[in-house]
Regions:
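Juxta-kinase regulatory segment immediately upstream of eukaryotic protein kinase catalytic domains
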Residues: 1-29
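Conserved ATP-binding subdomain of kinase catalytic cores across diverse folds
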Residues: 28-165
Length: 165
């Protein structure tokens, strides 16, 4: 099941994904008004029993509540590319990525969900105001290392879903 909104993200659904009984959740929307293509929530979790190695919170990414953002995400292949990256390419990533507990999409639509590690201890850049010079320099260096991993590798049929310029 792919939830259409945070209201469909239940304790039972999260329990299945995390492999432990989740008894309560507290979703908090994050990233509003900063140019994001989806609705993103930090979901604080409580478990039935003490857990080791399970998160106290996760981030849940869902389709935007704005039709124009959903349409643009589909038209540009953004949602599908993100889900497929986590499911098919993340093991080759040259940089750290969040742990992903679930990434699903109904191909060709805006129906998708990503449940991932909460990295709220890190800084997120506001897309509408931009980066400072040091952040931009760091981003370019990281993008170059990511790009290098797949240099001359994406022109194969199994990677034809990757948008090209």
């Amino acid at each position: 099941m792919i939830p259409k909104s945070i209201n469909e993200v239940s304790t039972a659904w999260l329990s299945d994904i995390l492999g432990a009984e989740v008894t309560s959740t507290q979703p908090i929307q994050i990233g509003q008004g900063v140019g994001l293509m989806g609705d993103i929530f930090r979901v604080e979790l409580k478990y039935a029993r003490a857990t080791t190695g399970l998160p106290d919170s996760v981030v849940v990414k869902l389709p935007s509540s704005f039709e124009e953002n959903r349409a643009q995400g589909v038209d540009l292949g953004m949602f599908e590319a993100e889900v497929r990256f986590y499911n098919e390419m993340v093991q080759d990533a040259s940089v750290g990525v969040p742990e992903v507990y679930l990434a699903e999409i109904k191909s060709g639509t805006a129906d998708f969900v990503v449940v991932m590690e909460d990295l709220s201890h890190l800084e997120m850049v506001d897309q509408s105001t931009g980066m400072n010079v040091m952040q931009a320099k760091s981003a370019v260096e990281i993008l170059a290392s990511i790009h290098a991993v797949w240099w001359d590798r994406v022109q194969v049929p199994e990677m034809d879903w990757i948008p090209t310029m």
